[in-house]
Amino acid sequence: METLKRKIIDEGRLLDGHILKVDNFLNHQIDVRLMNDIGQAFAERFAGTRIDKILTIEASGIAVAAIASQYFGFVPVVFGKKTQSLNLDAEAFESEVYSYTKQTSYKVRVSKRYLRPGEQVLIIDDFLANGAAASGLIDIVRQAGAEPVGVGIVIEKGFQPGRSKIEAHGIRVESLAIIQSFDDNQVHFG
């Protein structure tokens, strides 16, 4: 997706040569017009696939998933919660996920009321690097007896093993921008 790549080049920043900071348009301040284009792009990529629900993880995936939902017939968006909370049902699916950027593990939880056996679930997230978050969501979908029909990623670090981990589960991955390297402290797309 060329508009996304241009935005990454023009407005993204590299930290320590390996962390891409895109908080000014994707995961702190949100460029709604770009989000709309991203939602349309996911609809094109997954055209012809029955989608009953979209699953993401808090917090950065929520805006992307919610805007994408309108292009899939306004299907419900469910998001995995990263923290235990009094307002989360005791009956929940959970999976442990390691966060590379936060350098810690946490449990992702989804109420059993929101995922049902037989549902076809599209997973959407902002980044794919090592594949831990997506793998955790796939695990949750399968615990529910639902079917993960694909993973839609806004920005993939193609030089990390996330894609191969997801594809090893037999699940299709569609990324809108694939970064091949951060050589010379610059973003290089594949």
Curated annotation (Swiss-Prot):
It is found in: Cytoplasm. One of its GO terms (molecular function) is xanthine phosphoribosyltransferase activity. It comes from the Bacteria. SUPFAM superfamilies: PRTase-like. The keyword Glycoprotein does not apply. It catalyses: XMP + diphosphate = xanthine + 5-phospho-alpha-D-ribose 1-diphosphate. One of its GO terms (biological process) is xanthine metabolic process. Keywords: Cytoplasm, Glycosyltransferase, Purine salvage, Transferase. Its main location: cytoplasm. Xanthine binds at L20, N27, K157. Pfam families: Pribosyltran. Belongs to the purine/pyrimidine phosphoribosyltransferase family. Xpt subfamily. Converts the preformed base xanthine, a product of nucleic acid breakdown, to xanthosine 5'-monophosphate (XMP), so it can be reused for RNA or DNA synthesis. Homodimer. This is Xanthine phosphoribosyltransferase. It comes from Laribacter hongkongensis (strain HLHK9). The gene is xpt.
